[in-house]
């Protein structure tokens, strides 16, 4: 039987992979978005694990809201990146630092 600590260890590993990915690769925006999504998956895993082991469905319902916000975040982020690539020809972080508002 899988225990709560197994889920927490898995979630911690996924969270750390996301953090390391953000700190190591700061040049590609798509990779940064993927690492943020890994962090959100780790948080969702914690919510589902605690919800299951405590016998409460609130954590699982909260995961649906997080997934909805994450999907909207990715859609808007990719739309911005598409426009940035069309206008600048690159999606590097260095290009976004030169944007004027």
From Swiss-Prot:
The keyword DNA repair does not apply. The chain crosses the membrane at residues 4-24, 29-49, 61-81. It holds the Pfam family Oxidored_q2. Gene3D superfamilies: 1.10.287.3510. It is a multi-pass membrane protein. Keywords: Cell inner membrane, Cell membrane, Membrane, NAD, Quinone, Translocase, Transmembrane, Transmembrane helix, Transport, Ubiquinone. GO terms for molecular function: NADH:ubiquinone reductase (non-electrogenic) activity; quinone binding. It is an enzyme of class 7 (translocase). One of its GO terms (cellular component) is NADH dehydrogenase complex. It comes from the Bacteria. It catalyses: a quinone + NADH + 5 H(+)(in) = a quinol + NAD(+) + 4 H(+)(out). Its EC number is 7.1.1.-. It is found in: Cell inner membrane. GO terms for biological process: ATP synthesis coupled electron transport. Its main location: membrane. The keyword Translocase applies. NDH-1 is composed of 14 different subunits. Subunits NuoA, H, J, K, L, M, N constitute the membrane sector of the complex. Belongs to the complex I subunit 4L family. NCBIfam families: PRK05715.1-2, PRK05715.1-3, PRK05715.1-5. NDH-1 shuttles electrons from NADH, via FMN and iron-sulfur (Fe-S) centers, to quinones in the respiratory chain. The immediate electron acceptor for the enzyme in this species is believed to be ubiquinone. Couples the redox reaction to proton translocation (for every two electrons transferred, four hydrogen ions are translocated across the cytoplasmic membrane), and thus conserves the redox energy in a proton gradient. This is NADH-quinone oxidoreductase subunit K. It comes from Ruthia magnifica subsp. Calyptogena magnifica. The gene is nuoK.
